Amino acid sequence: MTMKKVSGDLAKNRDYLDRQLGVGESFDVLYRNVEIGKKNAALYMIDGFCKDEVMQKLLQHFIGITKEQMPEDAAEMSRQLVPYGEVDLCGDLDEICRQVMSGVTALLLEGYEQGILIDARTYPARSVGEPEKDKVLRGSKDGFVETIVFNTALIRRRIRSTQLRMEMLQAGKTSHTDICLLY
């Protein structure tokens, strides 16, 4: 199995990740273009898996970094300028895709040949209990709730495939109810 290496060219990395992760196809795959120390950067994450407060603090911190503070490589960047404990590096775009699908946030920067993986995930969970009418002998006891993002995050937690797509649609002339088509 060949490894798809992270390139120093952010546009190439973005093209590959956008295709693999389904950016623009799946509503829950979030992409954010940011500038960190005058370098273009891209953040990828799954809605419902990332802690909003942590991501907000990270973005605020990244925006405040100056060009002079920017290290030459991703290893130094992760050590010096990523204010979060659970940080890893990855040079394989396919592994970055797998990590994003499991809830990790990926940061790629122009000129860096490694991605920075920030584990700020939180998994959706329900209180212990099983549906009263759908008793099963074995298997998952997960059940859906009223919040669609919570439900799609539950599905992503079980099916971590880059091939899974989720399209948000609306049904009903009056209610405009949100529905999600998964394929």
Regions found by a protein language model. Name each.
Residues 1-182:
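Membrane-embedded alpha-helical signal segments
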